From Swiss-Prot:
It comes from the Eukaryota. Signal peptide: none annotated. GO terms for molecular function: DNA binding. Loads PCNA onto primed templates regulating velocity, spacing and restart activity of replication forks. May couple DNA replication to sister chromatid cohesion. InterPro entries: Dcc1 (IPR019128). Belongs to the DCC1 family. The keyword RNA-binding does not apply. One of its GO terms (biological process) is DNA replication. This is Probable sister chromatid cohesion protein DCC1. The lineage of its organism: Eukaryota, Amoebozoa, Evosea, Eumycetozoa, Dictyostelia. Residues 213-232 are annotated as: Disordered. Keywords: Cell cycle, DNA replication, DNA-binding, Nucleus. GO terms for cellular component: chromatin; chromosome, centromeric region; Ctf18 RFC-like complex. It is found in: Nucleus.
């Protein structure tokens, strides 16, 4: 440009260090701008196998390049010199973080038996700082997921029990209840600790997981730090009141895991389920929402149903792939049945109905029932 008498005209030139590759253009929404203005922490987390993300205290955003047809110039306000010219900017999109990576990380060191505690304690689980460094997610989302995974804190390290070990400890607790003629809402914690050969805090952890009142002491990192007993309505710290529904689901999972390769007929499953429970507990299939569904036993007799166990945690994390696998399990779904298997993959800002219609289409059966089938 050349100067003239117009005061609005500016002379800009290229700086001596052009192009300065230290600069990037970032398109930020008001929330991110407020974080910057208020000196809040923003963290960019990279990965060798995945794209980088930007994390606030409670949200996670992908960082992707958005190209433009025109060059954008970054000009120093003080010198009017061009620092860099770019034809792209970085766009932020809020996402559901891939927290299955956190589950895989914790279960890579899951406690599978009592002997694991005889090893170096530093080899058990992970510290919160280690988790934060490795997982591409905000701290709050990580904390919430740690609670969902029923982690416990042992000497400032986050630990999970393998499903087999957790089931084994609860099985021993229920066996002690039978031997001692204890009611399930009146389990003496000290007797469990005395009679079961397992670390005390593991026994207390399992009692809390399956009790009516789960009141963990939260360390701020999302785990459960065992301080005392389960507790009942009388606040007796030595008494744990087991939740009948949780015990029902535990027994159902045992049956479903054993029969995972061959679906059980509904009537057989319900009979076997009842046989594993005390007489005062009456199971209902609705308890298994998000765990199992009913599918036709055969194409020739669609009215006869079988029970299909679905482990939501091992389904694909990519929505399209998850829907594809679910429709391979059953060609028709009700929204109520499919919701627990897809809700963890719904992008922020999307409604359940909007998300479902992206990958499926609604139909009405001959009996007037509203269902969804695959769109692909």
């Amino acid at each position: 440009m050349t100067p003239n008498d117009d005061d609005d005209t500016k002379v800009i030139t290229f700086s001596s260090d052009y192009p300065d590759t230290d600069y990037r253009f970032l398109e930020a929404n008001q929330e991110i701008l407020d974080q910057i203005k208020n000196n809040k922490k923003l963290v960019i987390k990279g990965s060798l196998t995945d794209e980088a993300v930007l994390c606030t205290d409670d949200k996670t955003f992908t960082i992707r390049a958005g190209h433009t047809s025109n060059s954008m110039l970054l000009v120093s306000k003080d010198t009017n010199k061009i620092k860099v010219a770019l034809q792209y900017h970085l766009e932020l999109t809020e996402i559901q973080p891939k927290l299955n990576v956190l589950k895989d990380l914790l279960y890579s060191k899951a406690i599978d038996n009592s002997l694991d505690f005889e090893d170096d304690e530093n080899l058990l689980g992970f510290s919160f700082d280690e988790i934060i460094d490795r997982i591409q997610s905000s701290e709050k989302e990580i904390q919430q997921y740690l609670l969902k995974l029923n982690t416990l804190i042992y000497k400032n390290r986050y630990i999970v029990l393998s499903e087999n070990y957790e089931f084994k400890i609860l099985e021993l607790i229920l066996s002690e209840a039978t031997i001692g003629a204890w009611k399930l809402d009146n389990i003496p914690i000290d007797k469990c600790i005395e009679n079961i050969r397992a670390p005390e805090f593991i026994i207390k952890h399992c009692l809390q997981l399956y009790s009516k009142q789960k009141s963990p002491t939260n360390s701020g990192g999302g785990g459960e730090e065992i301080k005392g007993g389960g507790g009942d309505d009388n606040n007796d710290e030595n008494i744990c009141s087991l939740d009948f529904n949780k015990v029902c689901i535990f027994r159902a999972k045992q049956l479903l895991t054993l029969s995972n390769k061959s679906n059980m007929k509904f009537e057989d499953f319900m009979d076997n389920w009842k046989d594993t429970l005390p007489i005062e507990i009456q199971p209902n299939f609705s308890m298994l929402k998000g765990i199992a569904i009913l599918i036709p036993s055969s194409s020739t007799n669609p009215k006869e149903k079988s029970v299909k166990f679905i482990n939501e945690s091992i389904l694909p994390t990519i929505p399209k792939a998850r829907f594809k696998e679910l429709f391979q399990i059953s060609t028709r779904w009700s929204i109520d049945d499919i919701e627990p298997f897809i809700k963890s993959t719904i992008p922020p800002g999307n409604s359940l109905e909007q998300f479902i219609l992206t990958y499926s289409r609604p139909i009405t059966t001959s009996t007037g029932e509203k269902m969804i089938v695959t769109r692909f």
